[in-house]
Every structure is written in structure tokens, then in C-alpha cells.
């Protein structure tokens, strides 16, 4: 079994680190016999999804865990939905500031996760890890990445 884990490069003027990548980078190379492959993605509306799709074709993992940073959240929050919308308050790392536009002009309004999110949250709680289901991945690059992933899997 191969599990792909992704995190993001620093963004928004923070050149030191992005906690999403720090968490992924700290993972062991194998867990319970599964090979863990790790990639750091660009914080760009278009580039993150394109890079993830390239990696998916190359690595052909059995599972994907895309880790992002949600400022102010004090828990692990698996996402329920990716929406077809880009809007941010800071430019991405290519300098692009989206102020309200679709990710795909003819794409569906949203993609919903098919993961057993409540069971995942319960398992995290049982392990002593704060967790809650998130109903919004926002409208920045994390959302664009999740939308691209769900589109790729559809």
C-alpha cells in the first residue's frame, strides 16, 4: 500500500515554514506496512492542483492525505466539501489575488467527500486528538487543491 501525503510551501510573507509541510515531513517513511510518499506543493491556485494531479499519475497511490494550514483552528478538521470558487485576502505565491471567480467555468458547484468523516473524527478523538468535521475549506489554495483532487478522482 502506498499513501501520498502533501503539505504546502510557506506563503503570505512567512518564508520560514508552513506547518502543513512540517507535519507531513515529520511522518515516518512507513506506517503499519504502508509506504508514505511526501510532496511539498506550491501555494498557487493553479499550480497546487496541477502538481498534485501529476504526482497522482506518477505515484499511483492507494490513498491521499492532503494537509493544509487553517489559521485559528485548534483541531484536525477533515473537509466535507470543496467549492468551485477562488477568493483570497492575500496573493498566492505567484502574486495572483483572486477576488471571486470559479475554479472551473463549467465545473460543478462543489464536490463532496465520500470519506467516513464522522468515523475519522471519532477515531481521532479516541486517540486524544482534537478534531471536528469542517464544512468549509475556505476559498484559498487549500480549497482549490481539494477541488482539483476531487475532480481528478471523479
Where on the chain are the PLM-derived regions?
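N-terminal catalytic or cofactor-binding beta/alpha core of small enzyme domains
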Residues: 1-137, 152
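Small/polar glycine-rich anion-binding or flexible loop at a beta-alpha turn
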Residues: 138-142
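Active-site-adjacent mobile loop/cap segments within catalytic or ligand-binding domains
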Residues: 144-154
Amino acid at each position: 500500500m502506498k499513501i501520498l501525503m502533501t503539505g504546502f510551501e510557506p506563503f503570505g510573507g512567512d518564508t520560514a515554514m508552513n506547518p502543513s509541510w512540517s507535519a507531513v515531513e515529520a511522518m515516518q517513511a512507513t506506517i503499519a506496512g504502508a509506504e508514505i510518499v511526501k510532496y511539498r506543493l506550491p501555494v498557487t491556485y493553479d499550480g497546487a492542483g496541477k502538481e498534485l494531479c501529476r504526482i497522482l499519475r506518477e505515484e499511483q497511490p492507494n490513498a491521499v492525505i492532503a494537509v493544509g494550514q487553517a489559521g485559528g483552528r485548534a483541531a484536525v478538521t477533515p473537509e466535507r466539501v470543496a467549492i468551485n470558487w477562488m477568493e483570497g485576502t492575500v496573493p498566492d505565491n505567484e502574486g495572483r489575488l483572486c477576488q471571486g471567480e470559479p475554479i472551473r467555468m463549467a465545473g460543478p458547484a462543489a464536490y463532496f467527500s465520500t470519506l467516513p468523516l464522522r468515523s475519522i473524527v471519532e477515531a481521532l478523538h479516541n486517540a486524544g486528538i482534537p478534531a471536528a468535521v469542517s464544512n468549509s475549506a475556505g476559498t484559498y489554495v487549500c480549497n482549490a487543491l481539494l477541488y482539483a483532487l476531487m475532480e481528478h478522482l471523479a
